[in-house]
């Protein structure tokens, strides 16, 4: 059965890009792409018709406009129309290009022919309807932090990936040499996407294990403590997860947390401190940041 999709087109001030991106993700959009259009920025986002009606989309448009007013920026122009499955995949895919991240990785859309030679590690990806194309600052911050963390003796590292989405951080860790990853996501579509991206990158199933669930699911998948934890979810959710992280960690476990806006640094830092974690480094990209943490 084919799905009909809403295509939302949002023409906005470029500085609203990140806020809109997260609003759309929170709303449940699957697949988003953005491009510069003169002085403005055009975001396209897609979601199955069956999940939303006109009223939902009108409410979303109102929220986006309110965000702009609060930020003292011009209101975005929001339009939507229906497209069929074929147009959805070709439209979205044509807007997503290979992207170099850090010094070693190249994110490579699954539908492009693989180059015969690449200086970089090719991370092939078809996120389907899951979050994680590598285009978002928070994913990039996590991949760059992983590159640093896995610089020495990566082959000993077993990593927990909480909120794995498309599986991008698990696959990135394994390409950088990690021993094994265990990913969880509350969204079953993310589990499906992670598994097909694992296969796309020729990674053995036992090296990259994925299940539907959250942090409490991880000990059932791997009963030992993890060497590293990556988690790129919204700050409000991370605050709920931090008190549970010690249960899956050992004294020298490291963590990489993102999905955090700069103004949310303090509550995250306080929660980490209260739960026995120290901040080793804090990296920023635009208004997003990424905590590199270790046990106290
Ligand atoms: C921002 S995406 C990150 C995807 C990918 N790891 C990346 O870095 O691009 C966050 C993911 O976390 C999942 N998620 C949200 N709340 C969660 C929770 N409490 N436990 C596990 N996963 C969760 C969402 O379904 C989504 O796939």
From Swiss-Prot:
One GO-annotated biological process of the protein: methylation
Sites where the protein binds S-adenosyl-L-methionine: 139, 163, 185, 232
Pfam family, one: PrmA
UniProt-annotated location(s): Cytoplasm
GO cellular component terms attached to this protein's record: cytoplasm
Origin superkingdom: Bacteria
EC number, UniProt record: 2.1.1.-
Catalytic activity field: L-lysyl-[protein] + 3 S-adenosyl-L-methionine = N(6),N(6),N(6)-trimethyl-L-lysyl-[protein] + 3 S-adenosyl-L-homocysteine + 3 H(+)
Keywords: Cytoplasm, Methyltransferase, S-adenosyl-L-methionine, Transferase
InterPro entries (alphabetical): Ribosomal_L11_MeTrfase_PrmA (IPR050078), Ribosomal_PrmA_MeTrfase (IPR004498), SAM-dependent_MTases_sf (IPR029063)
GO molecular function: protein-lysine N-methyltransferase activity
CDD domains listed in its UniProt record: AdoMet_MTases
Role according to the record: Methylates ribosomal protein L11.
Family stated for the protein in its record: Belongs to the methyltransferase superfamily. PrmA family.
NCBIfam families for this protein: prmA
Protein name as annotated: Ribosomal protein L11 methyltransferase
Origin species: Picosynechococcus sp. (strain ATCC 27264 / PCC 7002 / PR-6) (Agmenellum quadruplicatum)
Gene that encodes it: prmA
């Amino acid at each position: 059965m084919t799905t009909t999709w809403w295509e939302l087109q949002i023409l906005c001030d470029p500085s609203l890009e990140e806020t809109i991106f997260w609003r759309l993700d929170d709303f449940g959009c699957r697949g988003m792409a953005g491009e510069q259009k003169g002085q403005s920025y055009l975001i396209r986002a897609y979601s199955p018709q069956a999940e939303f009606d006109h009223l939902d989309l009108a409410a979303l448009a109102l929220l986006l406009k309110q965000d702009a007013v609060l930020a003292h920026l011009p209101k975005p122009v929001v339009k939507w129309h229906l497209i069929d499955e074929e147009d959805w995949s070709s439209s979205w895919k044509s807007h997503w290009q290979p992207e170099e991240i850090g010094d070693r990785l190249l994110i490579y859309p699954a539908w492009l022919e693989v180059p015969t030679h690449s200086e970089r590690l090719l991370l092939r990806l078809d996120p389907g309807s899951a979050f994680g194309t590598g285009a978002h600052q928070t994913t990039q911050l996590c991949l760059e932090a992983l590159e640093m963390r896995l610089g020495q003796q990566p082959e000993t590292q077993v990593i927990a990936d909480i909120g794995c989405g498309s599986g991008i951080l698990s696959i990135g860790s394994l390409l950088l040499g990690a021993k094994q990853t265990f990913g969880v996501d509350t969204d079953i579509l993310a589990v499906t996407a992670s598994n097909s991206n694992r296969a796309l990158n020729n990674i053995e199933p036992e090296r990259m294990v994925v299940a539907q669930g959250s942090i409490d699911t991880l000990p059932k998948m791997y009963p030992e403590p993890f060497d590293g934890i990556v988690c790129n979810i919204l700050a409000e959710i991370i605050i709920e997860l931090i008190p549970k992280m010690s249960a899956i960690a050992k004294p020298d476990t490291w963590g990489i947390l993102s999905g955090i806006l700069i103004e949310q640094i303090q509550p995250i830092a306080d929660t980490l401190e209260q739960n026995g974690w120290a901040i080793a480094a804090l990296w920023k990209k635009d208004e997003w940041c990424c905590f590199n943490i270790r046990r106290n």
